[in-house]
Amino acid sequence: MSKVIEMKEKVVAEITEKFEKSIAAVVVDYRGLKVEEVTELRAKFREAGVEYKVYKNTMMRRAARNAGMEEMVADLVGPNAVAFSYEDPVAPARILNDFAKNHKALELKVGFVEGSFYDEEKLKELASVPSREVLIAKLLSSFNAPMANFACLIKAIADKKTEQEA
């Protein structure tokens, strides 16, 4: 086997492994982005612990098939990049969607999140979901609200009794 084919097979195996290990993978069309914009996007990904790579489409197609992500194959045309997340399933979609709002050249294509296929519409919906921390804060505040109301009620009753005694 030639060295070129061996190298290509190695890259396909690497991409397949990333698809299998990641909890989220989002493919974007980056055509028209300037170098500074791509650098800015990569910095945002780095902060969030997301890996952003550009691979040849033929290699990504083979890797997607190997990883059982057939739905993705049809959309792997044109200049594509893929963002892999191993911790936060929403981070790649959120970062890319926010970035695309200010940079019209960036286009969300498809993705997989925890084994489920997402098209562009679903990725945008996913990106609008608040972060885990925000959701936990909302949940805790909803638990806290009845207790706070009860405490205010007790205080009002105590104040009323104090007024009646005086």
Curated annotation (Swiss-Prot):
GO CC list: ribonucleoprotein complex; ribosome
> Which domain of life does the protein's organism represent?
Bacteria
**What Gene3D superfamilies does the entry give?**
3.30.70.1730, 6.10.250.290
User: What is any one GO biological process for this UniProt entry?
Assistant: translation
- GO MF entries: large ribosomal subunit rRNA binding
**This protein's record includes keyword S-adenosyl-L-methionine:** no
InterPro entries referenced in this protein's UniProt entry, alphabetically:
Ribosomal_uL10, Ribosomal_uL10-like_sf, Ribosomal_uL10_bac, Ribosomal_uL10_bac_type
UniProt keyword RNA-binding, yes or no:
yes
Which Pfam families does the UniProt entry name for this protein? Ribosomal_L10 (PF00466)
Q: Tell me the keywords, alphabetical order.
A: Ribonucleoprotein, Ribosomal protein, RNA-binding, rRNA-binding
Q: Which NCBIfam families match?
A: PRK00099.1-1 (NF000955)
**Subunit structure, briefly?**
Part of the ribosomal stalk of the 50S ribosomal subunit. The N-terminus interacts with L11 and the large rRNA to form the base of the stalk. The C-terminus forms an elongated spine to which L12 dimers bind in a sequential fashion forming a multimeric L10(L12)X complex.
Q: What does this protein do?
A: Forms part of the ribosomal stalk, playing a central role in the interaction of the ribosome with GTP-bound translation factors.
Family indicated by similarity = Belongs to the universal ribosomal protein uL10 family.
Q: Which PANTHER family match?
A: 39S RIBOSOMAL PROTEIN L10, MITOCHONDRIAL
Kindly provide the name given to this protein in its UniProt entry.
Answer: Large ribosomal subunit protein uL10
The taxonomy runs: Bacteria, Bacillati, Bacillota, Clostridia, Peptostreptococcales
